[in-house]
């Protein structure tokens, strides 16, 4: 009715065995995706759009596992079953991790995201840059210009159509 997407983002963990940003967030992102694979949410709500942060947790790294599990569960291919409705953001603090996200997940399903106060606030001694400088990772990924523009702007306008309408009214 409101045409507003939802972001699946957890809060802190009270269990000291689960570090909030190093384990709990990434576990929850991965768990959310698996629940979408197991279920049929988008059959009932075909226009619902969900954003999973942090590059989807372990999703890109284990894409083959999720494809196989979908098959074992008798679900359609992931591209049909979830990717028309699920998007991943680029809050991944490592160039090879960001590159894997772009290699595995279709560009149309990736939204640029930056941090205000990131999970890691330090400078990476290997690169000399802040770990959470997500723009630098996107620009260094070697994407064609049209794919980079999609990730940095156009996909967000698709996922957030009310924002697109507002920006168009402002001539942007």
What residue spans do the PLM features occupy?
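Catalytic pocket-lining loop regions of alpha/beta-barrel enzymes
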Residues: 1-111, 169-171
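Mid-to-C-terminal alpha-helical segments outside catalytic/metal-binding sites
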Residues: 88, 99-100, 105-111, 117-172
């Amino acid at each position: 009715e409101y045409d507003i997407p939802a972001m699946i983002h957890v809060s802190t963990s009270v269990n000291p065995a689960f570090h909030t940003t190093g384990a709990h967030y990434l576990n929850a992102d991965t768990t959310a995706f698996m629940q979408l694979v197991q279920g049929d949410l988008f059959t009932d709500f075909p226009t619902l759009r969900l954003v999973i942060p942090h590059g989807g947790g372990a999703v890109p790294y284990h894409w083959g596992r999720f494809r196989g599990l979908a098959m074992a569960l008798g679900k359609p291919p992931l591209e049909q079953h979830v990717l028309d409705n699920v998007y991943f953001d680029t809050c991944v603090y490592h160039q090879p991790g960001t590159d894997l996200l772009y290699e595995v997940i279709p560009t149309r399903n990736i939204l640029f995201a930056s941090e205000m106060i990131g999970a890691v606030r330090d400078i990476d001694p290997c690169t000399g840059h802040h770990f959470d400088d997500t723009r630098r990772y996107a620009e260094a990924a070697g994407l064609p210009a049209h794919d980079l523009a999609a990730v940095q702007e156009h996909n967000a306008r698709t996922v957030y159509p009310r924002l697109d309408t507002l920006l168009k009214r402002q001539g942007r």
